[in-house]
Amino acid sequence: MTKLSTVDPNASVLNPQRFIQRERENCSIDIDQVNTFLESDPRSRDLTHLIVDQLVNDPIIKADSATYDQTKLTQREVTVKKIARMALYMEQDIKTVRKHFRDTDLLKSLQDFGDTTTPPLTNKDLAIFDKRLSLVANMDPQLSTRIGVHLGLFGNCIKGNGTDEQIKYWLQTRGAILIKGIYGCFAMTELGHGSNVAQLQTTATYDQESDTFIINTPDLAATKWWIGGAAHSATHTACYARLLVNGKDYGVKTFVVPLRDPSSLQLMPGIAIGDIGAKMGRDGIDNGWIQFRNVVIPREFMLSRFTKVHRNPGATPTVEVDPQLDQISGYSALLSGRVNMVMDSFRFGSKFATIATRYAVGRQQFADKPGQPEKQLIDYPLHQYRVLPQIVIPYIISPAAFSLLNFYYSTLDELYAASSKNDKRALVVVSQKLKNLFIDSASLKATNTWLVAQLIDELRQTCGGHGYSGYNAFGKGYNDWVVQCTWEGDNNILSLTSAKSILKKFVDSATKGKYNKELDKRSFRYLDPQFIRKVFTSSSENKLDDLYDYTNIWAVALLKLLRHIAKQVDSTKDLDGASKLLVLVSKFHALYVMLNTYYEKLNSPTDSYVTCPKTKEQLWNVYKLFSLYFIDKHAGEFQQFKILSPDQISQVVQPRLLKLLPEIRKECISLTDSFKWPDGMLNAPIGYYDGDIYHNYFNEVVKNNPVEKDGAGIPPYHELLANMLTRGDEFARLGGANNAEILSKLTK
């Protein structure tokens, strides 16, 4: 890094890098083993390192401090350049996968999608690029979103709702899967409706004579709103609209609607589009609004895997709907984004944990006694309580994020295989898996995006005034992040819907003994009828003696909370009246799943990849601290529902929590170094690896705000300032008195 300061770093009284270096010298854990644990396995770890190295060194993709000063227009232009670069990476990533997994000529398949001898692109083909997209989200969320809307929303909507022929046409023949030919957006949300998809108002009316659909926006509230990519770039959209045939409303279905000519980007007839304007963050995304006025599309542009319209020339057109398949469509539509947001939570959380921890170790404030050195922030007990639990949050998220991602891909592969073959028996099984996947993805997405939003802001505050600087990532990071709490399912709505499904499962298990051990063992072991009976018949108090107790206590908490809600709803017949507690069920379920997945991975002799005893001990401390921290946060509920007694909270939970903090503090630098984020990924000078906080920070500020001979330079509004400061007495009268008279009164 070019040093722009004239100050000799060796002459500084404050030398924060020496504290960082001392922490690393005293490290007792194997950060390579921890990193492998966090990245799931050695192969995933190596791929992550390779991609991260490529991203931070790519002259177009890389981020630097200049990003924080860019205007909205500049951000959008830069983002498009980065999309073009990522498209090239995509082709290379697919070639790499096929070289290892498929004996086919990739170049031929890229050029000739009509060749039926060439296998279509699959999730496996996109595996490397999907990881690349996940990692670039940590550096540039708006870039990943721009591509994610096209591939993840537009593309997955077609894959989830289209027939095999439609999938091949739109994604391969038209080139969408390779970000070629067409560029898609996802028109679900309307000005008047978001979460309540069933009440969307845009219409798609079938015209039998022309064998087309006519798309219309019936009123202002039906305007498609918040549509990423719509304002300037999308050529097509996956439009959610009400299917109207012969005057009958068949509910909301999906249609591919052309918006612009791909060659000229001119709007198609009947399309009106605008930019929705200023947002909290992610200005590189051209969010827009769309209105349709008698827009005509062919019947074949309706995605027809689950619902088909038959023209029946000379007779009345008919609509074929398979209720089971239509239900599956409802579960699969937005799963990809929710699943990926759990992984985003791990990566984004680890980024800001790294920045704040390095600052806390390097920063000094106040001394115990005059003449003594100032203490490091991290050595204050309160600061430890504020920072260290935030470090362990991404640790506990990681195994659950990878597990959920694997569950998503395997379930979707089963769905596509079963629906393509119209295998009804297989569809019954996969529909149950999809329901469980919906519960887990909704609960984990909501809980973890909330956790990371709180993490970013709390850690920003722990960095004091420097955390407020735009150059230290927290401001943009928070503004870019918090949309995750709203889009692709508002967190409260997702929490309620997942909790209602969990409540139904609980009632079925507790009253009817209904429990599918094979399907539910992954996330719902606490709903096993035998475990339910044990919890409610045992007279012994819950303890935290064994390692698994730190997970099991959340299973007990869930059951007691669910029983309370079930009794309340049975008495009041008012499920909405239990909404506050239902949101808590979703949070507790997420915490249970995360702790259970972490426990199983670390406890596995083959899957943890941790062989160093001291390293494993510290990772168990991470696990215990997470559980204790959130028990303490929910101490009121744990006492209210008699999960733990007040004495257990005050004499066991809280003392253990406080005792663990100094243990985690000893390894706080090594624990955050284990994430292995290079400076280019952090883009926050107070968190750079070398720990030279003040020089790094000062240099980035001066680089982006060059010092002139007149200091910061004469401002363009200097005349306004000068006129104010040099105004005559006639501008400064107070009650008829001049300045001299006022001054004489004040000095008497």
Curated annotation (Swiss-Prot):
EC numbers for this chain: 1.3.3.6
Entry keyword Lipid metabolism: yes
GO CC terms of this entry: peroxisomal matrix
Keywords assigned: FAD, Fatty acid metabolism, Flavoprotein, Lipid metabolism, Oxidoreductase, Peroxisome
Principal place of residence: other
Catalytic activity reported: a 2,3-saturated acyl-CoA + O2 = a (2E)-enoyl-CoA + H2O2
Pathway(s) served: Lipid metabolism; peroxisomal fatty acid beta-oxidation
Swiss-Prot/TrEMBL cofactor(s): FAD
Pfam family name, one: ACOX
Compartments (UniProt record): Peroxisome
Swiss-Prot/TrEMBL GO biological process terms: fatty acid beta-oxidation using acyl-CoA oxidase; lipid homeostasis
Molecular function terms, GO-annotated: acyl-CoA oxidase activity; FAD binding; fatty acid binding
InterPro entries linked to this entry: ACOX_C_alpha1, Acyl-CoA_ox_N, Acyl-CoA_Oxase/DH_mid-dom, Acyl-CoA_Oxase/DH_mid-dom_sf, Acyl-CoA_oxidase, Acyl-CoA_oxidase_C, AcylCo_DH-like_C, AcylCoA_DH/ox_N_sf
Protein family: Belongs to the acyl-CoA oxidase family.
Record protein name field: Acyl-coenzyme A oxidase
Species, as recorded: Candida glabrata (strain ATCC 2001 / BCRC 20586 / JCM 3761 / NBRC 0622 / NRRL Y-65 / CBS 138)
